From Swiss-Prot:
InterPro entries to which the protein is assigned, alphabetical: DUF2039 (IPR019351)
PTM-bearing positions, type Phosphoserine: 136, 144, 146
Organism: Rattus norvegicus
Residues modified to N-acetylserine: 2
Pfam families from the UniProt entry: DUF2039
Protein name: Uncharacterized protein C9orf85 homolog
Keywords: Acetylation, Phosphoprotein
Protein origin, superkingdom: Eukaryota
Region spans: Disordered: 1-22, 108-155
Comp. bias regions, Acidic residues: 136-155
Length: 155
């Protein structure tokens, strides 16, 4: 594009056009990339949501390694990247957690606490223990049936 004064419009199309779209997980199939791709951007306005989705789409999104300080409560409670406010403060003030403006929130925060990895593992342990109980109940039923047959043959 020329730097000539007043020449602000481009008169020709783009010289090199990409034939394939960029795939952020084509060569990087790590767990971190999968988590980033699956992340739900809630509590932000439409513009901030589009910005965050663009960052994810083109591998520019970097998750936080440790919590940041909230600009409202001044506690280290901001766990989402590129956000300036923690979830409780953003919910209470009904503002975007990323830009801080009173825009319409596209996807509001969930009221219930997020399920942690510990509760998930407890649930799977619960399923295992239930299955063990069922197996042991079946064993007990089989043993009681065989005892009943023994009594019939002895009498």
């Amino acid at each position: 594009m020329s730097s000539q004064k007043g020449n602000v419009t481009r008169s020709r199309p783009q010289k090199h056009q990409n034939t394939f779209t960029f795939k952020n997980d084509k060569f990087d199939k790590s767990v971190q990339t999968k988590k980033i791709n699956a992340k739900l951007h809630d509590g932000v306005c439409q513009r901030c949501k589009e910005v965050l989705e663009w960052r994810v789409k083109y591998s520019k999104y970097k998750p936080l390694s440790k919590p940041k300080k909230c600009v409202k409560c001044l506690q280290k409670t901001v766990k989402d990247s590129y956000h300036i406010m923690c979830r409780p403060c953003a919910c209470k003030l009904e503002v975007c957690a990323k830009c801080g403006k009173e825009e319409e929130i596209v996807i509001p925060f969930n009221k219930e606490p997020e399920p942690s990895e510990n509760t998930e593992s407890e649930g799977s342990n619960h399923r295992r223990s239930c299955k063990r109980k069922e197996d042991s109940d079946e064993d007990l039923d089989a043993e009681s049936d065989s005892e009943g047959e023994d009594e019939d043959t002895q009498a």
